[in-house]
């Protein structure tokens, strides 16, 4: 018996001692944290990252909405990405925090189903949005004369609608199928949220055929956009190196590399989770990998896609200057 089994058994016994009568239909989440000062410190770190991610995404959304200079296709797609990230990180971290603070690991069947659906829908939407954003940069740099036509408001709205619809439909199909399966083993989910691979380990019938469906979905929704991103940025770099000076080339390489690092972090970790066979899974490793696409990427996206942009940083400075002036005026009015 390994340490993961011991922890799971302890949580199971603890839940039974609390007299939870709904244990037969509810699930129990092992969680990311156990109890102790090290895990309490880790909880504080995660809570801080969550707060920073919320603040960064909310600020970027409002900044794009309020500043008319940022009402362009690129920033429209970026605002949609921030909305997705805002909802994405809020799907898992608050429940994880409540479970840790209240020492209650229970999640109701319906709550688990809703969390699975929302998480899958937002993950699929983000994967497609990142692909569309790379296409926007490709058109802007490689086909600037055709940019107004290829990235019109109508096309941008169609891209966003396609991303949301595809992510939602994919999530609905998988959630509907998984939660009609017989969970005839322990209701203990060795994860910090309800995720399809973790749920499949509780199913008593053979799920190998369905796992091929998960693999196919992962290749379509995750791998294809990632390949499109790689191709787009490769073409962008080729064009930049043919046309720009050394300074422009260095800036393009720096920008593209930062975008690629964040995108690669998201796609690599999600592909690692959703395209591996069940026999190669490790609950502890799966939880560690999940932290990257549930917490780290929503934290990094607003900063990576905006801090290197002069228009966004300029808008932030103007907004802060306006806020400081207003605060000074309000302070002086008291006297």
Swiss-Prot record:
Name of the gene: OR2AK2
GO terms for biological process, alphabetical: detection of chemical stimulus involved in sensory perception of smell
Recorded topology in the membrane: Multi-pass membrane protein
Organism: Homo sapiens (Human)
Disulfide pattern: 112-204
Annotated function: Odorant receptor.
Name of the protein in its database record: Olfactory receptor 2AK2
Gene Ontology CC: plasma membrane
Keyword vocabulary terms for this entry: Cell membrane, Disulfide bond, G-protein coupled receptor, Glycoprotein, Membrane, Olfaction, Receptor, Sensory transduction, Transducer, Transmembrane, Transmembrane helix
Cytoplasmic topology ranges: 65-72, 136-154, 235-251, 308-335
Localization annotation: Cell membrane
Extracellular compartment segments: 1-40, 95-115, 174-210, 275-287
Pfam family, one: 7tm_4
Family per similarity comment: Belongs to the G-protein coupled receptor 1 family.
Membrane-spanning segments: 41-64, 73-94, 116-135, 155-173, 211-234, 252-274, 288-307
Any GO molecular function: G protein-coupled receptor activity
């Amino acid at each position: 018996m390994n340490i993961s089994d011991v922890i799971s058994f302890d949580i199971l016994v603890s839940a039974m001692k609390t007299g939870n009568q709904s244990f037969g239909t509810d699930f129990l989440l092992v969680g990311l944290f156990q109890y102790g000062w090290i895990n309490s410190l880790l909880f504080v770190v995660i809570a801080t990252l969550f707060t920073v991610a919320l603040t960064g995404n909310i600020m970027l959304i409002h900044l794009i909405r309020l500043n008319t200079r940022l009402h362009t296709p690129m920033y429209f797609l970026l605002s949609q990405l921030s909305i997705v990230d805002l909802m994405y990180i809020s799907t898992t971290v608050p429940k994880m925090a409540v479970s840790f603070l209240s020492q209650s690991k229970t999640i109701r069947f319906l709550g688990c189903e809703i969390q699975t659906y929302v998480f899958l829908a937002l993950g699929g939407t983000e994967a497609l949005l990142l692909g569309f954003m790379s296409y926007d940069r490709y058109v802007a740099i490689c086909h600037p004369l055709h940019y107004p036509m290829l990235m019109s408001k109508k096309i941008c709205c169609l891209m966003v609608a396609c991303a949301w619809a595809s992510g939602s439909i994919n999530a609905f199909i998988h959630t509907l199928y998984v939660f009609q399966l017989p969970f005839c083993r322990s209701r203990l989910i060795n994860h910090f949220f309800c995720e399809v691979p973790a749920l499949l380990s509780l199913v008593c019938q053979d799920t190998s055929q369905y796992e091929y469906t998960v693999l196919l979905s992962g290749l379509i929704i995750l791998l294809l956009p990632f390949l499109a991103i790689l191709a787009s940025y490769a073409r962008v770099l080729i064009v930049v190196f043919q046309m720009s000076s050394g300074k422009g080339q260095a800036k393009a390489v720096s920008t593209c590399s930062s975008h690629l690092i964040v995108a690669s972090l998201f796609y690599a970790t999600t592909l690692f989770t959703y395209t591996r066979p069940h026999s190669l899974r490790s609950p502890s490793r799966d939880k560690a990998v999940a932290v990257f696409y549930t917490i780290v990427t929503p934290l990094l996206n607003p900063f990576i896609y905006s801090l290197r942009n002069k228009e966004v940083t300029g808008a932030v400075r103007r907004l802060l200057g306006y806020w400081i002036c207003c605060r000074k005026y309000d302070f002086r009015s008291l006297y």
